[in-house]
Amino acid sequence: DFVKSLGTPRSWRNACAALAVGLAERRRRRIDAGRCNGEWFANSVGIGLDALVVGAADRVRWLPGLLAYPAALALVLRRGVDAAQIRLEADGHVMEVPASMVIACNGAWFGGLFHIAPPASLDDGLLSVVIASPLSRRRVLTLVPRAIRGTHIAAPEATLFTARELVVETAAPLPLEADGEAAAPVSRMEVSCVPAALSLIV
């Protein structure tokens, strides 16, 4: 996901060649990073449906390549899609809404397949925040192809905006994921963008 956002060649041979050129020419690119509850992340962090899928993906790691996340989504949908009432504060603006997922993105891609936040940029000093309202199983399935293409953001169930700082609170702890790794459930998620935090050879 992060490689896609960076524009790095996907082939390891081409990536190594690009790295060699970058080293020789001393090319650097400063990009943003994120912090969530005191911990660093590079690509994205979220609570709700995305975190449930990440947790389920750990149970199907034996599947090859990009099949793990669709299989994990199928496992999650067997149980149904839960939603929670959230209180969200973004750069001082407060909203209270029911949501099945809140994901804060530094990069544009998630889960190897999903163009979850098409406008996201690694060097704009902002996080792209995607909120999904309560969804039925059937609606999730109809939105999956759109999420792969990045057209889901036009759906009425999706809200997209940018913020430098974000606080999400829920009455009960929800599953959390950061950069595709499951973390302990939380009832408060404090997220911020740290501009130009990383220097990469390009």
What function would you assign to each model-found segment?
Residues 1-2, 102, 128-130, 140:
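Hydrophobic alpha-helical segments that either span membranes
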Residues 59-68, 109, 113, 118-139:
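Gly/Ser/Thr-rich active-site loops/lids in small-molecule metabolic enzymes
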Residues 46, 103-116, 182:
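Glycine-rich phosphate/pyrophosphate-binding beta-alpha loops
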Residues 90-91, 121, 131-202:
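ATP/nucleoside-binding phosphotransfer catalytic cores, i.e., glycine-rich phosphate-binding loops
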Residues 82-84, 98-100, 123-128, 162-166:
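A generic structural signal for short beta-strands and their flanking turns/coil linkers
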Residues 1-100:
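Catalytic core of DAGKc-family lipid kinases
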Residues 91, 100, 104-109, 132-135:
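Histidine- and/or cysteine-centered catalytic micro-motif in compact active-site loops
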